[in-house]
Amino acid sequence: MKKLFLGLIWVYQRFISPLTPPSCRFYPTCSNYTKEAIEVHGPIKGAWLGIKRISKCHPLHKGGFDPVPLKKDNNHQHCEHHHH
């Protein structure tokens, strides 16, 4: 599923986006954000983050720098060694 989503983004970036004027209000662009979100968080959560981002990309939103959130590290939530 990850390869499918990334492939769709590649097709959009390669063949559709060049035909339209630049209009994304964010950095990174919504398609690059979605691609990175899928790489970092996997296809389901990454696609969801991309959909949420795209829904904010309109003239009434100020846009700006909006990076993909970091993946939470669950390894340190249940620390089992004891501190003295």
From Swiss-Prot:
* Major place of residence: membrane
Q: Name one Pfam family in it.
A: YidD
Q: Name one GO cellular component term.
A: plasma membrane
The protein's topology relative to the membrane is: Peripheral membrane protein
What UniProt keywords are attached to this protein's entry? Cell membrane, Membrane
Q: Where in the cell is it found?
A: Cell membrane
- Family annotation (HAMAP family): UPF0161_YidD (MF_00386)
Relate the protein's function as given in its record: Could be involved in insertion of integral membrane proteins into the membrane.
Family (UniProt)? Belongs to the UPF0161 family.
Provide the protein name: Putative membrane protein insertion efficiency factor
Q: Which organism is it from?
A: Staphylococcus carnosus (strain TM300)
